[in-house]
Amino acid sequence: MPEPKHALPAGLTRRQALKLLGAAGLVAAGAAAGCKSPVPGADMAPSVFVAKAADYTVDLGASLRRGLAELGLGPTEIAGKRVLLKPNLVEPHAGAGHINTHPLVIQAAAEAFAALGAASVTVAEGAGHRRDSWLVLEESGLGEVLAAEGLPFCDLNTGPVHVVQNLGGVSRLGDLWLPDALARADFVVSVAKMKIHHWAGVTLSMKNLFGVMPGSIYGWPKNVLHFAGIEPSILDIAATVRPNLAIVDGIVGMDGDGPIMGDPVAAGVLVMGRSCLAVDATCCRIMGIDPAAVAYLRQADGRLGTIEAARIRQRGEDPAAVRRDFALLDYVPAHRGLRLAP
């Protein structure tokens, strides 16, 4: 883990320093709350970039910068923008790097956006299983990285919220409550982990958006969303939030009984694109999974974008060349029939 670049203020714990950074970042953002208008229409010919990364010691920043360039993202689009990075922080398991988005991926993403002239970069998450997002932040190792880089963290489970129209209309959730911090961002990035999921089949950049739903409204572990149906809720949230970019950490992913109890699997890739749906479909193919067999991806096809390989402009590595079949469990209904043909 990198050494902190800034000493902590005298008398402050790391958690207190992170909270102060978070408050300062949110004050600096300053814009009035209100949901961004969704991107009109679905991109039916999106680009997805795949980079090899053998482990977390390689130059992740170079891979992400190349990916951004391949996707046409440069200073013209990012300069002066408030960027929000939304990692996958599930459980405070120290040393279990296959559970949460790796801290060094977040660090590399923050540096890449700063280099493009972003006005600010904030890391924000509403941990799903634990009420204390700060505990998950610290034990995941991300807190140390944020403190070292002077990056603010925002707990999306608490704080002011506002109601927006549910633009998906698939579940019975009705209107959605979202954090004001999400609305203040100009550019939202879902920085997910590549994992098998016990109930949904896979959890990638779209399922990662459960973490933007405030626990103060939707409970723990976001039980309201579960009661409304995991897959319909994924579709509604993805259609409403519409992240500007998805990055999936597949350097070490999780197979088997994910998203918490599974085993680490070294897939050795970073996957990124402007369409969460196309990114997730590409990730599935890398995992040896047919995206059309994942119910919520199939339902999103044609509504939020495309899952068809022929329509996705692949950049970087060929997904077939980096395929690493993730283990599926025969006794889990959501895993049956997912395997992609050779």
Task: Enumerate the predicted regions with their spans.
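N-terminal and secondary-structure boundary signal
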Residues: 2-342
